């Protein structure tokens, strides 16, 4: 048998070198056939030891344990592995589904490039022991000799024969999907088997002889690299043969057969070998209940015998994708370090599937932050396959809770015969309880009515009202909880009580059943005595429900209510037995039996426990916090309410439109708009309104409609039209009030808010200024200003709620989407019910409040129990991943109190002590001057005066009661929104930013000086403070100093020495650094070396020093920006090294960033770079990369020059943008696409970043504006200025 030789200076290991220098597999030597052309492989060779090919490919890959591996050697191995890993990554990109290795010369040439990689690798690592090579290296080591020394030479020599593998009679679909290498090897195995069978004319006898060795070696390779073969009959290969085809095989002599089956000669042997192979595998020692851990140790699992493990079905799924899963090991490692998900072991297949799925669902939350999009998508695909297994196995239908021994902890526990509800069902049921909010009031009516008579009366309004509410509740459960009509046992006893107490009497057949005996029941009602007054005990149900809402012994109270209702039936049973017909007693017993069966089904014992009353009377202890970490909201949202989509500013605004808009708005801004008094001089309101109408007509056809202009227009629309006359009555007082220092501070805070944060900024302004205006100017003025602010906020975001629009006592969302509002409404339903009852406690005047103060404690205690459920349900929103702010002053009032063992007692003690000081003369005087002045006494009006009341009584209360009552009342009385923070989150005042970058006054003043002052004037401005400061109330402006002339030569040398740290990374525009693979090293160097070096300089070159630090900080220390930079970095880096990229950035390198003209030069230079490179970057890297580059360069340009404008990039018509931040479906969230406000003044947008507390939970980098108007900024200063 002849083989074409592959010439080389030295043959690879495990091969035999023929005398003529050609290479053949080592096990061909001495096999009785001359495979070398000179026959040297069959000549006796003394002193030479060879190794069989099958021994090579099956050699162990782990010669030692991890403990024997030196760290330095492992690093060396990893470095030596890089060429092979890179080669395999290129192979993974090949499309082997539509192209065959045996017929495609392109694919063959790709594999030839890797033929010497193992030799190079072995020379690189030398004689290492105990270290684990990369799994890809192991796989290629098994495949290389087979491919390069056997398959490739044979395919080239007999190309015509192997191309016949494309024959339609050969089934090419039977390949492994484990990995590209597995798919390749199994496709060769299938093709050679087929060619051996059909023996096409294009195959010579030499070619036919080559097929069998190749096929046999593929079997070894498939086993060695742990390929998962497709499910097919192991004993035969089926081929579809054309009737006209002549076969040279002896088995094809029968022309009548359409199907030719070639039986494997060693069927039983192969089966036995497979079983032995499975049995010989080591036992599975990886805990697959930890989903991410199983992905990290994928090869260990797939090489183990997991057939008897409950997780075997999952192991089959992940092992089918083992190489693809293994590529993202870094992702799994990072996730394991941070995720804290509950791990539940399993004893059955269904338990394993559900446990794995739940654990993976929890881990995905962390993976979204730590892993690449491709890794996330892979996990989502895997989760979908597990879901398919759950559905196919009917795990949800067959799932039954294992019988548990009763917990002997002294408490009362239900023993329901129903399966436990899932977390999603529990959350859905909590939402349905909203339908029963009014049921408690209706139940109290039974105390004055005859229970049986009302049920038997078809026209009973009480029963009809109760059953109407219950019908809506049941309809909600059917639609959102019991979709498969399978009931479950609720953890919330209120749901169970509703079913026990209401289902029997509200069923369609119950009332007609008793209505037949109404005459008898009516007679019983008129003759009722103490023994037959059965409904009297039902009066306690209202109080029982009240206690259950507070979370007090819910399970025990449920059964107590069940026994009360049953006793009522028993009482009626005795009366009916004595005075009614036998049919009436039978029908009543039928109804009682139905109710009893429901109670026992929900878990109540048939006989009441002897200590039931004692359990209910016990003090309530604060439950231990749940150890299971919060998960993304799994509650099914209620139907999304119809809400108008908030306006989005148009991004298409040409230079001509910008100039036209400047001219239109200039006359209006000359009146100096003000957020409270409309304009700086309110008496000129008529002239200002004329200018506003002119502005409207002028800008009607303009494409430039920035958000701030919309808000300003809404304010003027209100002040100049419908509320003009009212404004003229209160304008003087509003103007005077706006001069007060506290109000001026409010306006300053508002000025730092961007239009995109209008809702939050407007709420702060409203809560801060309205009380002052109300006190100084009266309610009419306060109402006018409140409407004025609301118009501004709603013009920018129609969903925004400000001031009185915020419902009292409810959990609300600020700046939330319709989907987020739906989640809040759903998760907060029980809390909102309690909040509505808090409002009732504050009605009726001060005496009523003091009387009801005892009822406030249990209400708050109930809220404490429900707060944790709410935070778990809405955890995703509370993490700060979106701009949605969840607010509840009631929840914040309970912060700290709810952590005590007895929250009700703590609140009761503190508030009772506070109002117990009413006998103190000074305390009484404080009440008369604040609370007693209220005409309408409710929680909303009380909040307006409580701050003054607290300040007045503080000394007395602290001396007698301590600080706690003050803290509770402050939280309840705050006029601001009360953001709910997740568990253990630090408390940061929402209206006090933790870090302030250059203030609005600085930015505005710099723009003003550009248009109104000389350059020399601006240079004389005082140096800007570097610490966070309260905006000055004077007209003095600030600008950063630029000591470019006073540093001297030594200062320049020190600065340039710091810059050398950047030079080693080839610092440049567009890609920022030359090698995109070194971002981690660059950021480490910048934070540890470069930034401290520059900040330590005695003399800094500004603005170059600050701009350089600001640019690096905005990338390296913002996780999302750094992630995007790494995502696009390789492509951007390659572009900057291309001829086109070099041409675009060459002129930028000529800019002297230390020169006094650098701000203007940098602005022009960055603009030129962006104009030159945008289209090419879009072609190479996509429009997402363009937007990323634009964002960081806009920030860089503004750090040099606050008034710099970059031309906004526009996508080409045929561009396609790939969303690299796609979130998996299980998260229920899609990425928020932020449309940049192209005409927003840069000062406002920069101010937005100042106003928001920067923390680790920030999920998106600050949005930089792309357009700024110098003249508009100069004219708008009075709009935000302090008076």
UniProtKB/Swiss-Prot annotation:
It is a single-pass membrane protein. Residues 34-45, 1016-1026 have a biased composition (Acidic residues). Disulfide bonds join 11-23, 18-36. InterPro entries: LDL_receptor-like_sf (IPR036055), LDrepeatLR_classA_rpt (IPR002172). SUPFAM superfamilies: LDL receptor-like module (SSF57424). Keywords: Coiled coil, Disulfide bond, Glycoprotein, Membrane, Transmembrane, Transmembrane helix. It comes from the Eukaryota. Residues 261-272, 1005-1015, 1027-1044 have a biased composition (Low complexity). Pfam families: Ldl_recept_a. Residues 626-647 have a biased composition (Pro residues). GO terms for cellular component: membrane. This is Uncharacterized protein F44E2.4.
């Amino acid at each position: 048998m002849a083989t074409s030789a592959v010439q080389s200076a030295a043959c690879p290991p495990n091969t035999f070198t023929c005398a003529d220098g050609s290479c053949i597999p080592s096990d061909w030597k001495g096999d009785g056939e001359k495979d070398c052309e000179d026959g040297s492989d069959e000549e006796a060779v003394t002193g030479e030891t060879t190794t069989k090919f099958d021994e090579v490919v099956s050699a162990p890959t782990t010669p030692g344990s991890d403990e024997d591996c030196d760290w330095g050697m492992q690093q060396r191995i990893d470095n030596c592995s890089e060429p092979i890993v890179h080669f395999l990554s290129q192979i993974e990109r090949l499309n082997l589904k539509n192209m065959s290795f045996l017929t495609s010369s392109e694919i063959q040439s790709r594999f030839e490039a890797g033929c010497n990689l193992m030799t190079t690798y072995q020379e690189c690592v030398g004689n290492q022991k105990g270290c684990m090579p990369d799994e890809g290296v192991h796989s290629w080591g098994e495949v290389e000799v087979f491919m390069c020394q056997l398959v490739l030479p044979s395919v080239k020599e007999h190309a015509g024969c192997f191309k016949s593998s494309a024959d339609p009679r050969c089934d090419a679909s039977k390949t492994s999907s484990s990995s590209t290498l597995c798919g390749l090897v199994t496709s060769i195995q299938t093709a050679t088997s087929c060619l051996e069978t059909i023996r096409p004319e294009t195959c010579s006898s030499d070619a036919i002889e080559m097929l069998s060795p190749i096929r046999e070696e593929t079997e070894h390779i498939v086993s060695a690299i742990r390929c998962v073969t497709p499910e097919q009959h192991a004993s035969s290969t089926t081929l579809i043969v054309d009737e006209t085809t002549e076969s040279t095989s002896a088995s094809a002599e029968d022309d009548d057969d359409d199907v030719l089956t070639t039986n494997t000669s060693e069927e039983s042997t192969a089966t036995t070998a497979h079983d032995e192979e499975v049995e010989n595998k080591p036992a599975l020692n990886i805990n697959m209940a930890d989903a991410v851990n199983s992905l990290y140790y994928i090869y260990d699992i797939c090489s183990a015998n997991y057939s008897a493990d409950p997780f075997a079905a999952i192991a089959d799924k992940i092992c089918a994708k083992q190489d693809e899963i293994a590529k993202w090991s870094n992702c799994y490692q990072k996730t394991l370090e941070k995720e804290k998900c509950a791990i539940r072991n399993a004893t059955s297949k269904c338990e394993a599937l559900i446990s794995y799925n739940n654990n993976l669902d929890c881990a995905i939350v962390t993976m979204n932050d730590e892993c690449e999009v491709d890794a996330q998508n892979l996990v989502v695909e895997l989760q979908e396959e597990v879901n398919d297994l759950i559905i196919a196995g009917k795990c949800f239908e067959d799932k039954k809770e294992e019988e548990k021994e009763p917990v002997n902890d002294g408490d009362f526990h239900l023993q329901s015969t129903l399966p436990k509800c899932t977390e999603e069902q529990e959350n859905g049921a909590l939402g349905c309880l909203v339908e029963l909010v009014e049921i408690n009031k209706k139940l109290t009516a039974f105390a004055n009515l005859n229970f049986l008579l009302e049920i038997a009366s078809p026209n009973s309004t009480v029963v009809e009202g109760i059953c109407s509410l219950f019908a809506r509740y049941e309809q909600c459960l059917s639609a959102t909880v019991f979709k498969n009509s399978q009931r479950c046992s609720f953890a919330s006893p209120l749901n169970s009580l509703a079913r026990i107490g209401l289902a029997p009497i509200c069923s369609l057949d119950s009332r007609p059943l008793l209505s037949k005996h109404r005459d008898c029941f009516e007679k019983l009602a008129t003759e009722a005595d103490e023994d037959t007054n059965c409904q009297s005990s039902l009066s306690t149900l209202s109080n029982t429900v009240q206690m259950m809402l507070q979370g007090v012994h819910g399970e025990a109270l449920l059964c107590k209510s069940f026994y009360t209702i049953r006793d009522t039936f028993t009482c009626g049973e005795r009366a009916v037995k004595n005075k009614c017909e036998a049919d009436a007693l039978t029908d009543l017993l039928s109804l009682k039996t139905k109710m009893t069966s429901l109670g026992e089904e929900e878990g109540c014992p048939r006989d009441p426990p002897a200590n039931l009353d004692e359990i209910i009377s016990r003090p309530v202890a604060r439950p231990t916090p749940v150890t299971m970490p919060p998960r993304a909201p799994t509650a099914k949202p209620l139907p999304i309410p119809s809400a108008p989509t908030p306006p989005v500013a148009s991004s298409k605004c040409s230079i001509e439109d910008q100039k036209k808009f400047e001219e239109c708005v200039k006359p209006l801004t000359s009146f100096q708009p003000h957020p409270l008094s409309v304009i700086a001089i309110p008496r000129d309101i008529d002239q200002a309104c004329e200018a506003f109408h002119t502005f409207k007509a002028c800008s009607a056809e303009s494409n430039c409609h920035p958000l701030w202009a919309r808000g300003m227009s809404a304010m003027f629309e209100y002040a100049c039209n419908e509320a003009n006359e009212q404004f003229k009555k209160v304008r003087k007082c509003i103007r005077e009030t706006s001069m007060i220092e506290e109000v001026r501070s409010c306006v300053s805070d508002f000025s730092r808010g961007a239009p995109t944060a209008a809702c939050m900024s407007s709420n702060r302004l409203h809560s801060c200024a309205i009380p002052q205006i109300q006190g100084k100017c009266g309610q009419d003025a306060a109402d006018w200003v409140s409407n004025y602010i609301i118009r501004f906020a709603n013009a920018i975001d129609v969903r925004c709620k400000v001031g009185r629009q915020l419902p009292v006592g409810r959990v609300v969302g600020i700046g939330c989407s319709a989907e987020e509002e739906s989640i809040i409404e759903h998760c907060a339903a029980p809390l909102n019910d309690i909040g509505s009852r808090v409002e009732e406690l504050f009605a009726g005047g001060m005496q009523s409040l003091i009387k009801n103060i005892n009822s406030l404690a249990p209400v708050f205690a109930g809220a404490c129990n429900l707060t944790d459920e709410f935070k778990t349900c809405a955890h995703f929103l509370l993490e700060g991943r979106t701009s949605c702010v969840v607010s509840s002053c009631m929840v914040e009032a309970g912060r700290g109190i709810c952590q005590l063992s007895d929250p009700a007692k703590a609140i009761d003690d503190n508030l009772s002590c506070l109002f117990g000081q009413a006998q103190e003369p000074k305390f009484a005087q404080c009440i008369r001057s604040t609370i007693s002045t209220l005409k309408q006494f409710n929680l909303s009006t009380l909040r307006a005066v409580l701050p003054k009341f607290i300040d007045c009584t503080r000394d007395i209360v602290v001396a007698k009661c301590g600080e706690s009552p003050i803290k509770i009342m402050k939280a309840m009385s705050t006029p601001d929104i009360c953001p709910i923070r997740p568990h253990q989150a630090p408390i940061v005042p929402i209206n006090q930013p933790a870090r302030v970058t250059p203030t609005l006054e600085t930015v505005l003043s710099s723009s003003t000086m550009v248009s109104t002052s000389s350059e020399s004037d601006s240079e004389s401005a005082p140096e800007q403070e570097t610490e966070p400061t309260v905006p000055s109330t004077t007209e003095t402006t600030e600008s950063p100093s630029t000591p470019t002339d006073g540093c001297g030569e030594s200062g320049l040398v020190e600065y340039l020495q710091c810059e050398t740290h950047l030079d080693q990374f080839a610092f440049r525009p567009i890609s920022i650094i030359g090698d995109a693979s070194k971002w981690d090293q660059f950021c480490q160097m910048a934070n540890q070396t470069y930034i401290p070096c520059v900040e330590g300089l005695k003399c800094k070159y500004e603005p170059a020093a600050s701009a350089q630090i600001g640019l690096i900080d905005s990338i390296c220390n913002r996780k999302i920006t750094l992630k995007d930079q790494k995502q696009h970095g390789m492509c951007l880096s390659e572009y900057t090294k291309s001829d086109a990229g070099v041409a675009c950035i060459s002129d930028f390198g000529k800019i002297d960033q230390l020169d006094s003209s650098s701000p203007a030069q940098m602005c022009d230079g960055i603009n030129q770079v962006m104009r030159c490179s945008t289209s090419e970057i879009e072609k190479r890297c996509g429009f997402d990369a363009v937007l990323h580059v634009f964002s960081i360069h806009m920030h860089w340009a503004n750090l040099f020059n606050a008034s710099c404008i970059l031309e906004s990039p526009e996508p080409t018509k045929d561009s396609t943008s790939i969303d690299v931040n796609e979130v998996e479906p299980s998260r229920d969230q899609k990425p928020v696409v932020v449309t940049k406000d192209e005409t927003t003044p840069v000062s406002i947008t920069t101010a937005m970043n100042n106003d928001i507390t920067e923390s680790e939970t920030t999920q998106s980098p600050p949005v930089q504006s792309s357009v700024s108007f110098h003249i508009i900024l100069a004219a708008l200063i009075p709009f935000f200025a302090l008076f």
